[in-house]
Amino acid sequence: MRIGHGFDVHKFGGEGPVIIGGVSVPYEQGLIAHSDGDVALHALCDALLGAIAEGDIGRHFPDTDDKWKGADSRALLRDVYRRVKEKGLELGNADVTIIAQAPKMAPHIKHMCAAIAEDLETSLDNVNVKATTSEGLGFTGRKEGIACEAVVLLVKKSY
């Protein structure tokens, strides 16, 4: 078994929507990023890479490389998961916590879980996404951006 933890944050700016958990969430602003700014999938990528001791998302998809400009984070997640499988591992479960005062995530959580489960080739009962606020505190509380944490458990492939 291997455990990984990931964290990501992006600042609001420009036009919406917000892409998070592989889902387009309507909002008046988007997130400033080199790729599509999907904090949930970026945190998940970092958790997976950490679990296999392969660094972080910046090492594999650097924001200094125009190849990744505007990249679809679902494609990045699938690429990272390919690396996981190459190590003889598969997802046991993933738990994602989105920290945002806005936009409201609840109506989109099921769709996020479905997108993540699809990209990680697993069943819905192995993926959990939840959202919380910071009770008006800090940059997320002031609606300046969104943060996300992710934890994964990887297990040996069951073939």
From Swiss-Prot:
GO terms for molecular function: 2-C-methyl-D-erythritol 2,4-cyclodiphosphate synthase activity; metal ion binding. The record marks H34, T133 as: Transition state stabilizer. It is an enzyme of class 4 (lyase). Pfam families: YgbB (PF02542). A divalent metal cation binds at D8, H10, H42. Its EC number is 4.6.1.12. Pathway: Isoprenoid biosynthesis; isopentenyl diphosphate biosynthesis via DXP pathway; isopentenyl diphosphate from 1-deoxy-D-xylulose 5-phosphate: step 4/6. 4-CDP-2-C-methyl-D-erythritol 2-phosphate binds at residues 8-10, 34-35, 56-58, 61-65, 100-106, 132-135, 139, 142. Belongs to the IspF family. HAMAP family: IspF. This is 2-C-methyl-D-erythritol 2,4-cyclodiphosphate synthase. It comes from Aliivibrio salmonicida (strain LFI1238) (Vibrio salmonicida (strain LFI1238)).
